[in-house]
Swiss-Prot record:
Name used for this protein in its record: Serine/threonine-protein kinase dkf-2
Phorbol-ester/DAG-type zinc finger locations on the chain: 314-364, 466-531
Cofactor entry: Mg(2+)
GO biological process, one term: innate immune response
Length: 1191
């Protein structure tokens, strides 16, 4: 074959036309061959560049086939490849001829212009230079390219069927249909196969998707290829979700093979992208970001169905000692310490705090592993690889990683996500298995986050959520997590994604709102929009998903572990995750998922997550007032232990009129614990006849405090021991030792004075038991007196430095059996006297509190104190003593029903009739005189109202410093009912039943011009534990008297349930309660709060997807949503009134009316329904032949 056998293909300059498409003409061809670069150089020795002008940007180009010579400009370009090839397809009745011209170098354009021609559309011309060729052109040919330095044209012409084609078609019909196979080449830059030829047919237009035929479009365009078939797809937006991509591929396969039954073909589809820069041209598509503009997607049909699995690469973490300052790769803070500062991953080499180990992603990429010398650094030298090992490794990783991109919904049904962890991932990527490491280097207690979190992460919708940065001052050296450089400065060093991580503070395990990402101010603009905090919260209700939302399968509770993507790690040992022989999967281990789910929420709970805050009990902040000016009754050093913990603890006790406070020392304000006097049930001294270890005991409802002594055993030894600065721990005290040590002998101690001097002495001590003998001989009276004199001298010497001779003497006389007179101990030792002084002081403090002043905010509040008894108090109640109140009611201090800003509610019982009551104790000392109306409002309102829907007020008693409000006691509250329900939310029927009673109670209160102002589920009490209980409103501490057309402006209520006008400090009226009703209905039906506190309420209300995500609102009626929207109106004039809410169609239901009639029959009073509705519902019963249940 000589040079004349090769067709000549030229690009020539043409004037720009009005159309943006390049025109390509086929002039003539006499043969079909494949050209290489060397062939072009060999057969093109002469040039006539004068004949051809250069190509400029924007000009049209024409592909010609002439007998002229190829311009030198095109021949010498390294990236110029021209190929012609003719292929006959056995399953079609026509043959295809391909002509491909690629210009991939910007130097081929006009001189000095480095731009390129992008996204051009090539279409066949309407005429051919050789009219004898009878060809049918393929309609609507379109091609796009994402390479910014190349443009290309691809032309396909269809021949009329020949005799050979007809014969091949008949042979094909006799054989079974076979799906195209996967071709993998090791030299992608020089090898061309039929899968790389661009054959275009009419573009596919699936339903419900907008496509554009224009070459200039702002969306995403890519190509689908299956065998020799190829389609161009254009979608709006910059990304396409993997679920939609798989659907496009599935529809494409169905279209090109319409006669075949696809069935569950979607389970067999694998999607790859062509990447000529990689060793293996075809790269598995795992995320939506893999599909960019111009990507060629190869559809490969697997030999077996691929179950949905989630791929994780767990880190192999072990304790590591760093020689240079190192920062945590998770939080960015410095790893402090001299040795064993943190954990290092054996695979990827990343470093973490131990505290961060349970939060890190399972994303070990093994980048730390050493590259073998045989592995090339570029694809061009890839033929030296051991292809068998590489293909096996690549095939395993691809098959295991493919399911990270699978949609959860399949044709055959949903499947529970599986997790596959290969043994290669868990072993040593460099030198052997992880278990072969020395035990001292192995970490069996640190790993990543739990597996159920991997499922939630993999199945969530991945949307771009920007970080909310705020200037932050760091207390520890921290690096920027974007540029990995240190945040310099003393204050305001950088920016942090704002908000504190409140995961540990929330008992229901709610996720944090912010990710606390750290970066420089200059780097904040370049940080990716991937805030994990908000994304977690808003993942399940935003349209499409990358990986799809997986459906649950109850019968699949095990997860196969495998290698995979970059996710965050589980709280199980790293080593046990590796595979073992006989595990059931090649190269991997089948790991039971039962343990992973034992402490994790159910899949139903995971799938129902939304951007809204989970419903929880809102705790009002208490005003913790520490009255430093209270009358001090007694103070001193005390050693104590409890019946629950036998460890001796020494603190400086201060007894005042409110309680006992255990301080760290005499001067500090920090205290260890506080025992309020109202929690003390009794104080008892130890019996003199019985030998005991403690002096006296303090009994509370929670535990018993045993007062051991005023000095510890260790401190006593420090006084009497003479060896320099060595304090020995005391031996175990026997029950017959009366609290003193059972050993004797000579010892030494180092006593440091307050000025810092040191005194050392060696003393021999013979210790006696009370009424007993020593281990050597019986002590005589003279020996006892001699020993006592020794101890007395020691105490006197120590007192010069400690200043506590009395305490030393008391302790020694108590423990050694000597009295202060020098004789053996009797019942009236100094220890007993010291115990009696403490018990007397505590018992005196437990007596009724005498009138005394307190200081709040620097102002005296004596105005609220009433010095004499029997008079009328400020609230109109008769002053009584606490003894008189205790004779009438018994308060159960351990039964705390609730606590709030004004006081605490305890359970109690009426001593005379045995009726259980709720007693609200309000401490008047917490309120200054100008807030006295807050105390009076609730009492006045409760005395005024009388309705079955409002809690019944019984009695109010006032003492000198407390107010006792006695009310009826009910079973529980509405919040407890919601949280304890099976799904964490109530059904529509139950919600309607409760809301109907709430609205009726509000109608009564508003008629009395009373606005509750703090309506929330915690303040809605239930009288029973049934599904349809009676409800009553309580807690009128924020209630206000507001007329029909009046407005008030004050601080009221709980922010989570307050209307916008209150939060903005604007005037509010009785419609405030209606907003609260809307929030109550929302949280009852969904189990979440409707709004986020950091976003504008108007924007959240207008965003229907935010307010009502599919889970669970797709199960709730439209009337309920309309009812909520009518209540949650920002403008007060548009908000429903009580009457309008009661007449709403959602509340007008026969089932509700029937349930309410049953309740009224049980109560014995008709207070919710009205007689005017009876005729309408009786007619409904007759029309639908319904038997009433309320009769």
């Amino acid at each position: 074959m000589d040079a004349n056998d090769f067709p000549r293909l030229f690009y020539t300059s043409m004037p720009s036309s009005s159309t943006s498409n390049h025109r390509i003409d086929r002039l003539s061809s006499s043969s079909s061959s494949t050209f290489r670069r060397d062939d072009f150089r060999r057969h093109s020795t002469t040039t006539s560049s004068e004949k051809f002008s250069t190509i400029s940007i924007g000009e049209s180009v024409k592909l010609e086939e002439e007998n002229g010579e190829i311009p030198e400009k095109f021949v010498q370009e390294e990236d110029t490849v021209v190929k012609t090839e003719e292929t006959r397809v056995s399953d079609c009745d026509f043959s295809l001829t391909f002509y491909t011209a690629h210009v991939t170098s910007s130097s081929m354009l006009s001189r000095g212009d480095s731009s390129s021609i992008n996204n051009k559309t090539f279409t066949p011309d309407d005429h051919y230079s050789n009219p004898s060729d009878k060809r049918r052109e393929v309609p609507s040919i379109r091609s796009t390219s994402s390479n910014s330095s190349s443009f290309g044209g691809h032309v396909a012409f269809v021949d009329e069927p020949s005799e050979e084609n007809q014969r091949q078609q008949q042979q094909y019909q006799q054989h079974q249909f076979q799906l195209p196979t996967l071709l993998v080449t090791s030299t992608p830059s020089t090898v061309f196969d039929q899968n790389d030829d661009d054959v275009f047919t009419s573009p596919y237009h699936p339903p419900n998707r907008q496509y554009s035929s224009s070459s200039e479009m702002s969306g995403l365009s890519f190509q689908l290829q299956s065998g020799i078939h190829k389609k161009s797809i254009a979608v709006e937006g910059n990304e396409i979700a993997l679920r939609d991509l798989r659907n496009e591929a599935f529809q494409f396969v169905k279209e090109i093979y319409p006669e075949k039954k696809c069935g569950s073909l979607e389970d067999y589809i694998l999607l790859y992208k062509h990447d000529l820069r990689s060793i293996n041209i075809l790269q598995l598509i795992t995320t939506s970001s893999d599909v960019t503009d111009g990507t060629l997607v190869e559809i490969v049909i697997g030999s077996c169905p691929q179950n949905e699995r989630i791929v994780v690469h767990p880190h192999t973490l072990f304790v590591h000692s760093y020689k240079v300052p190192t920062f945590c790769d998770f939080c960015g803070e410095l790893l402090f310490g001299l040795v064993k500062q943190g954990l290092k991953c054996f695979g990827c080499g990343l470093n973490y705090h131990k505290r961060c180990a349970s939060k890190i992603p399972n994303n070990c990429n093994g980048s730390k592993q050493r590259r073998p010398s045989a592995i090339p650094l570029s694809p061009s030298n890839s033929n030296i690889l051991n292809l068998n090992e590489r293909r096996q490794s690549r095939r395993d990783s691809c098959l295991e990683a493919l399911d990270a991109a699978r949609p959860s919904s399949t044709l055959g049904g949903a499947a529970t996500p599986n997790i596959f962890i290969t043994s290669d991932d868990c072993g040593d990527p460099v030198g052997g298995n992880f278990l072969q490491m020395p035990r001292k280097d192995r970490s069996c207690s640190w790993s990543g986050r739990p597996l159920w979190m991997e499922i939630a992460e993999a199945t969530r919708v991945k949307i771009q959520v920007p970080h909310t940065f705020q200037v932050h001052s760091y207390k520890l050296p921290t690096v920027c997590q974007h540029c990995k450089k240190l945040l310099k400065g003393l204050l305001r060093q950088g920016m942090q994604c704002r908000g504190e991580n409140e995961t540990e503070k929330l008992q229901n395990g709610a996720v944090a709102k912010y990710c606390k990402y750290n970066c420089h101010k200059k780097c904040s603009e370049h940080v990716a929009k991937d805030c994990s905090g908000n994304t977690k919260a808003s993942q399940f209700f935003l349209g499409t998903a990358d990986d799809g939302v997986s459906e649950d399968r109850d019968d699949d509770l095990s997860l196969r572990s495998g290698s995979g993507g970059h996710k965050k790690a589980q709280n199980t040992p790293s080593a046990p995750l590796q595979g073992s022989e006989g595990s059931g999967s090649p190269g991997g281990a089948v790991v039971s998922f039962a343990q992973g789910l034992s402490n994790a929420p159910d899949d139903d709970v995971i799938s129902s997550e939304s951007a809204n805050i989970p419903l929880m009990r809102v705790v009002m902040s208490k005003k913790q007032t520490k009255r430093k000016n209270n009358k001090l009754l007694k103070e001193g050093w005390i050693v104590h232990y409890t019946d629950q913990q036998n460890m001796r603890k020494k603190h400086y006790w201060r007894l005042d009129t409110k309680g006992i406070t255990m301080y760290q020392d005499e001067n500090t304000t920090r205290y260890y614990k506080e025992i309020p006097l109202n929690e003390i049930l009794g104080v008892m001294t130890s019996s003199p006849e019985k030998s005991s270890e403690y002096l006296f005991e303090i009994r509370t409802g929670a535990c018993v405090y045993f007062v051991y002594s005023s000095l510890t055993d260790e401190e006593l030894y420090n006084i009497i021991h003479a060896s320099p600065c060595i304090a020995r721990k005391p031996s175990t005290v026997s029950s017959t030792d009366s609290g003193y040590l059972g050993s004797s002998g000579a010892s030494s101690s180092c006593v440091r004075s307050r000025e810092g001097s040191t005194v050392s002495s060696t003393i021999t001590v013979d210790r006696t038991r009370r009424g007993g003998s020593t281990t050597s001989t019986e002590n005589s009276e003279a020996e006892s007196e001699s020993s006592y004199s020794s101890f007395a001298s020691i105490a006197s010497t120590a007192s010069k430095y400690l200043g506590r001779a009395a305490d030393c003497l008391v302790l020694m006389t108590k423990r050694n059996g000597w009295s202060d007179a020098g004789s053996p101990a009797d019942e009236k030792s100094s220890g007993s006297l010291d115990a009696q002084s403490w018990t007397t002081a505590i018992q005196s403090a437990l007596m009724p509190v005498t009138p005394q002043s307190s200081v709040v905010g620097g102002k005296r509040v004596d105005k609220l104190k009433v010095p004499t008894e029997g008079e009328t108090g400020h609230l109109g109640a008769k002053i009584q003593t606490e003894q008189e109140f205790s004779q009438l009611y018994q308060i159960f201090a351990e039964e705390v029903l609730g606590s709030g800003q004004f006081g605490t509610v305890y359970g109690g019982i009426h001593r005379r009739n045995g009726q259980h009551v709720a007693v609200k104790l309000i401490d008047k000392l917490k309120f200054p005189p100008n807030k006295e109306d807050l105390l009076r409002a609730e009492v006045q309102i409760l005395e005024q109202v009388d309705h079955p829907g409002v809690v019944h007020f019984m009695q109010m008693l006032e003492t000198t410093d407390r107010i006792f409000v006695v009310m009826e006691k009910l079973k529980g509250d509405m919040l407890e009912m919601i949280l304890s329900s099976e799904k964490g939310r109530l059904s529509e029927r139950t919600t309607q039943f409760l809301v109907a009673q709430i609205l009726e109670a509000l109608r009564y209160l508003h008629h009395q011009n009373i606005v509750h102002c703090d309506l929330k589920p915690e303040n809605i009490l239930l009288n029973s534990n049934s599904d349809f209980p009676q409800v009553k409103l309580c807690d009128f501490g924020f209630a206000r008297i507001i007329g029909e057309k009046s407005f008030r402006r004050s601080v009221v209520g709980t922010p989570a349930y307050l209307a916008p006008e209150v939060l903005r400090n604007k005037g509010f009226n009785r419609s405030l309660d209606m907003w609260s009703v809307g929030v109550i209905v929302y949280v009852s039906l969904s189990g979440t709060f409707p709004f986020n506190e950091d976003e504008d309420i108007n924007d959240q209300i207008q965003n229907a997807e935010f307010m009502y995500p599919p889970s669970p609102w797709k199960e709730i009626s439209e009337n309920a949503i309309e009812f909520i929207n009518g209540l949650l109106q920002v403008k007060m004039s548009k908000r429903y009134t009580v009457a309008k809410a009661q007449s709403h169609i959602w509340m007008q239901n026969y089932t509700i009316w029937s349930d309410l009639r049953v309740l009224e029959k049980a109560v014995g009073q008709r207070f919710v329904t009205h007689e005017s509705d009876d005729s309408r519902w009786h007619a409904y019963e007759k029309e639908h032949n319904v038997t009433p249940v309320y009769v």
